[in-house]
Amino acid sequence: MKKKYKKVVVGGTFDRLHLGHKALLRKAFEVGEIVYIGLTSDEMIKEKQYSERILPYEKRLLDLIKFLEVNKYRNYRIMKIHNAIGFTTKIKSLEAIVVSEETYKGAVLVNKAREELGLRPLDIVVIPIIRSRLGCKISSSLIRAGLIDPFGNPIRREEK
């Protein structure tokens, strides 16, 4: 089946791969023949909530590769990124960026940076936010805080 785009990009920390990450990656592979995945460096995540609980880059990389292999995704490149723009201005032939509603602003910044260099802006493919059983968005921050699991289920605390 012909894909809409030849080369697409998606990026993130991908800490404790959850349903939201998986939906984002699935959409990227659904629309793109080749998927470039920007994986944030350890240095870039220092300002994130509960950053001390974020898994190291190498562990996040292995978890990401495992997900890609289990789902038989083959046409991808994972590249370490050190800022929000990453390699999106270096690969001129990129055609689209896949983001969630929450990270749409990042896609706008990427396009601004590309346009400043005379590059074609990327089409922006947006997926909806995936909600937990509590009704809030599934996020790595909530998982790191011990409030939900990667499937969006609340974590029950033992009463004392």
Curated annotation (Swiss-Prot):
Role description: Reversibly transfers an adenylyl group from ATP to 4'-phosphopantetheine, yielding dephospho-CoA (dPCoA) and pyrophosphate.
Q: Where in the cell is it found?
A: Cytoplasm
**Similarity annotation:** Belongs to the eukaryotic CoaD family.
- Identify the EC number(s): 2.7.7.3
Q: Could you list this entry's UniProt keywords, alphabetically sorted.
A: ATP-binding, Coenzyme A biosynthesis, Cytoplasm, Nucleotide-binding, Nucleotidyltransferase, Transferase
Q: Which organism is it from?
A: Pyrococcus furiosus (strain ATCC 43587 / DSM 3638 / JCM 8422 / Vc1)
InterPro entries in the cross-refs:
CoaD_Thcocales (IPR054937), Cyt_trans-like (IPR004821), PPAT_arch (IPR023540), Rossmann-like_a/b/a_fold (IPR014729)
> What GO molecular function terms would the record report?
ATP binding; dephospho-CoA kinase activity; pantetheine-phosphate adenylyltransferase activity
Is Nucleotide-binding there in the keyword field? yes
Could you confirm whether the keyword Protease appears in this record?
Answer: no
Q: Which domain of life is it from?
A: Archaea
What name does UniProt use for this protein?
A: Phosphopantetheine adenylyltransferase
Q: In which pathway does it act?
A: Cofactor biosynthesis; coenzyme A biosynthesis
TM segment ranges: none
Q: Which cellular components does GO assign to this protein?
A: cytoplasm
What general EC class does the enzyme of this chain belong to? transferase
Q: Which reaction does it catalyse?
A: (R)-4'-phosphopantetheine + ATP + H(+) = 3'-dephospho-CoA + diphosphate
Give the GO terms filed under biological process for this record: coenzyme A biosynthetic process
Pfam families linked to this entry: CTP_transf_like
